[in-house]
Amino acid sequence: MSLQAPKGTKDLLPTESYKWQYLENKFRNIAADFGCREIRTPVFEYTELFQRGVGETTDVVQKEMYTFEDKAGRSITLKPEGTSPAVRAFVEGRLFNETQPTKMYYFTPVMRYENVQKGRLRQHHQFGIEIFGAKDASVDAEVISIPVGIYKELGVEGVELNINSIGCPKCRKTYNEALKKYLSKNYDKLCSTCKTRFDKNPLRILDCKVDTCKEIVKDAPIILDYICDECKDHFEALKSYLDVLDIKYKVDPFIVRGLDYYSKTVFEFIIDDITICAGGRYDYLIEEIGGPSMPAVGFGMGIERLLLTLQEKAIEIPEEAYVDLYLGNMGDKAKLEVLKLAKELRDRHIKCEIDHMGKSVKAQMKYANRIGAKYSMVLGEEELNTGKVSLKRMEDGQQIEVDIKEIDTLIKVFK
């Protein structure tokens, strides 16, 4: 039996990688437009980071993390999300001493042991943006505007933005008491996990995926009725900023997100009942991880889910030709000249491919066509004697005669 990739993982083959490169380049440019710079963090972290950051009672920590002991007996976890590592790097690098805000973006693989289904893998990839040091709701609106702009630029229609406020620790305490009072009436019907959450973190019950629990929380108290004046003012300001930016949204009082570090603003972008991007504010996470008290907000966008959405919407990602010129050859002497010519062209950043297989001219041209080369030329004895060669544009078959030695003239064709 041949070896296969582990369940829930997928190879990115050359025939598909151009789509990822296209999105990554677009995301980098958009992030730069907002003043964000890239951060890269390790693929694994100490488990304590996610226990403290994501939360002990979350599904991520309790059920989904890939955790193991290294040879020194330290508990290590493969990264299940991107925000906590970014915050850890921010604190460890003492970036809080720099002029704020600090704006970061990242591309990262994340690993979660989940049921494998359409658009959900055990290793998937996220594009994320995190902004540290700014507490005004205008930053929340700016962060939300980034995915809005991405979907618009890609031509993705039908995306819904849902927003909510889950308050701060002070007002959430009051809400938790009301929620527990409501849930106590149906305590026996809660799943075993939610019974544990009842005392430790009842808010997590609102995020439970078990059908009986989902049914119970349908009539639960709404958190927006319990948030303090400061959180209420922040949420009203956010809505005003979104209105100014002409960003359509719906208030969904049951969005709580599956990670404990969120406070105040939370949001989700949904298409066809699937969340394709989510985020919010996490004003207490930096301090929890060992830094100073400092506000922060960000989001994570699943790249595989975005690609699946583009496919379902029949939105094609343009594939650029990865070969500018195919250099065919006939005979050993011609092959030597082709090798030298290819080197000169590659030194000038012209993408070239040559025949190493000894194919016939007909087979070489078929290959040039199959790989999508923009141009082709074939050097043989006659071309070497005259110093002239026909340069063929593969798109329409148009040919022009060029001097083999006139590299600058040849370069102009590709610029």
Curated annotation (Swiss-Prot):
SUPFAM superfamilies referenced in this protein's UniProt entry, alphabetically: Class II aaRS ABD-related (SSF52954), Class II aaRS and biotin synthetases (SSF55681)
The record's section on Gene3D superfamilies has: Anticodon-binding domain, Bira Bifunctional Protein, Domain 2
Q: What class of enzyme is it?
A: ligase
User: Keywords, A to Z?
Assistant: Aminoacyl-tRNA synthetase, ATP-binding, Cytoplasm, Ligase, Nucleotide-binding, Protein biosynthesis
The Enzyme Commission number assigned here is: 6.1.1.21
Its subcellular locations are: Cytoplasm
Q: Does the keyword Aminoacyl-tRNA synthetase apply?
A: yes
Coarse class of the protein's main subcellular location:
cytoplasm
Which biological process terms from the Gene Ontology are attached to this UniProt entry?
histidyl-tRNA aminoacylation
Q: What GO cellular-component annotations does this UniProt entry give?
A: cytoplasm
Q: Extract the InterPro entries matched here.
A: aa-tRNA-synth_II (IPR006195), aa-tRNA-synth_II/BPL/LPL (IPR045864), Anticodon-bd (IPR004154), Anticodon-bd_dom_sf (IPR036621), His-tRNA-ligase (IPR015807), HisRS-like_core (IPR041715), HisRS/HisZ (IPR004516), HisRS_anticodon (IPR033656)
Query: Per its record, how is this protein called by name?
Result: Histidine--tRNA ligase
- This chain's source organism reads Clostridium botulinum (strain Hall / ATCC 3502 / NCTC 13319 / Type A)
Gene symbol here is hisS
